[in-house]
Curated annotation (Swiss-Prot):
Superkingdom field: Eukaryota
Family note: Belongs to the short-chain dehydrogenases/reductases (SDR) family.
Lineage: Eukaryota, Metazoa, Ecdysozoa, Arthropoda, Hexapoda
This protein's name: Alcohol dehydrogenase-related 31 kDa protein
GO cellular component term, pick one: cytoplasm
Keywords: Oxidoreductase
Active site: 152
Record-listed substrate binding positions: 139
Molecular-function GO terms, alphabetical: oxidoreductase activity
Amino acid sequence: MFDLTGKNVCYVADCGGIALETCKVLMTKNIAKLAILHSVENPQAIAQLQSLKPSTQIFFWTYDVTMARADMQKYFDEVMVQMDYIDVLIYGATLCDETDIDGTINTNLTGMMNTCATVLPHMDKKKDGSGGLILNVTSVIGLDPSPVFCAYSASKFGVIGFTRSLADPLYYTQNGVAVMAVCCGPTKVFVDRELTAFLPYGQSFADRLRTAPCQSTAVCGQNIVRAIERGENGQIWIADKGGLELVKLQSYWHMADVFLHYMQDKEDD
């Protein structure tokens, strides 16, 4: 169980849709500080959030998830002046544009990895932080493939692979930072807009998705926070159809068994 009371939360996402609803729930958890990082500011949404809990400090910084790692490091050095420390990092920036493969990969995957790598030293209990939690908000088509949104699905599969890798005890026992992911099912904010399939053969299916049943952003946001509070390091959750379900992870190639000797410390030999 993870208690959000008094925690400093950094949320990388737009201040609308699922992110806004998640932040609304976070504001009911007596968090100390909330930082929202995105390329476009939404003053109305931030004012709405502040009205929910005036005692919680809210910050907004303009943030480009595609910036170079060196620039990110300078950026977060400035963020930390106001935040002091980060207990929870939530990465929810996402792009589904099958006509822009580079943008989709850079936003959903590369930007997430660079952000995590940049923020981790500020959370690492052996460095500048006291441990904490990283939550990657991803998609159910990062678990099962999508013949319609191939690039988007590939980027989300990458998020799952990175999350599970970073959650390995090799890191967690040292830095004290748990890493999890929540895979959101079809949500209203996603299907309400025009969608383009990777290949023309899938376009009729993409068009029909706009009328498919989907969960509300409010319910999805509630379940994202539930996953934070209930989850443990390495877990992957599905937030779909108004519910929250833990994914039963399976290993097909047991790396530790095959390379155990090479993965041991020299002192263990």
